[in-house]
Amino acid sequence: MSRLVLAIGNSRWHWGIFSRDQAPQFWDAIAPHQPFSRSDLATFLQAQDPAIVADTPIAIASVVPQQLALLPEDWPQRRLQLRDVPLTNCYPQLGLDRAIALYEAGCQAGWPVLMIDCGTAITINAGDAEGQFAGGAILPGVTLQLRSLAQGTAALPSVEISAEGDRWGMDTQSAIASGVIYGIAGALRGFIEDWRSHHPQRPIYFTGGDGELLAKLLTDLPDIRVEPHLLLHGIDRLAQAMMTDPD
């Protein structure tokens, strides 16, 4: 039987289908503005995988709790909370997505581990040798920085970001792109080097929509791993564990 997972983010819903017989499937969708009916949700899911049947339970992690109301109440759901993540030393306001993705990185690579989620905001998340949350940082992501420049400065053009862009921009677009992308990469390098001074030769996970892009700028650092769907893998791992041990 297929297993459905859903990560509800600030602007997009991230879906995954896991099963024993085939590789996982992943896709994103813009956050809906209207509630799903039961039949609409079934149609939406079966367009991705015809094998999905109505009432297939969905394991959910949401950083936007109000969007949970957009799902039909009578569709089976397991809504994860921070207390469901076996990661100790978490402060109460720690984002559920951060905790799950860090836990999954630790499950995949062992502890200690560093996980960097490059989404709307970029979060840097450290786990120590005992599997505890060991602190982190939050900074504006690529899109958020570009949006801030556009809103705060008149007549700036739209900009496309590329890891192959020249550091020394020869026009406004390339100068903005360089400032944003290399500025973020420089900040991340500082955190990584500090963490590695305490935990040499331990892996660094990059995830999120801009994870691969930013990781390309740090390829000189050892053991950088890109896992775009780390959060969805973590949701599935936790949901399976909860089914095995519901207490």
From Swiss-Prot:
Requisite cofactors: NH4(+); K(+)
Any one GO MF annotation of this record: pantothenate kinase activity
Gene Ontology annotations of biological process type: coenzyme A biosynthetic process
Organism: Synechococcus elongatus (strain ATCC 33912 / PCC 7942 / FACHB-805)
Pathway the protein contributes to: Cofactor biosynthesis; coenzyme A biosynthesis; CoA from (R)-pantothenate: step 1/5
Entry protein name: Type III pantothenate kinase
Alphabetized HAMAP family for the sequence: Pantothen_kinase_3
Subcellular location(s) per record: Cytoplasm
Coiled-coil annotated residue ranges, if any: none
CDD domains: ASKHA_NBD_PanK-III (cd24015)
PANTHER family: TYPE III PANTOTHENATE KINASE
Cofactor annotation comment: A monovalent cation. Ammonium or potassium.
Transmembrane segments: none
Entry's EC annotation: 2.7.1.33
Residues reported to bind K(+): 117
Disulfide partners: none
Catalytic activity: (R)-pantothenate + ATP = (R)-4'-phosphopantothenate + ADP + H(+)
Function description: Catalyzes the phosphorylation of pantothenate (Pan), the first step in CoA biosynthesis.
Pfam families given in the database record: Pan_kinase (PF03309)
Class in the EC hierarchy, top level: transferase
Domain of life of the native organism: Bacteria
Record-annotated active site: 97 (proton acceptor)
Positions of substrate binding: 91, 95-98, 172
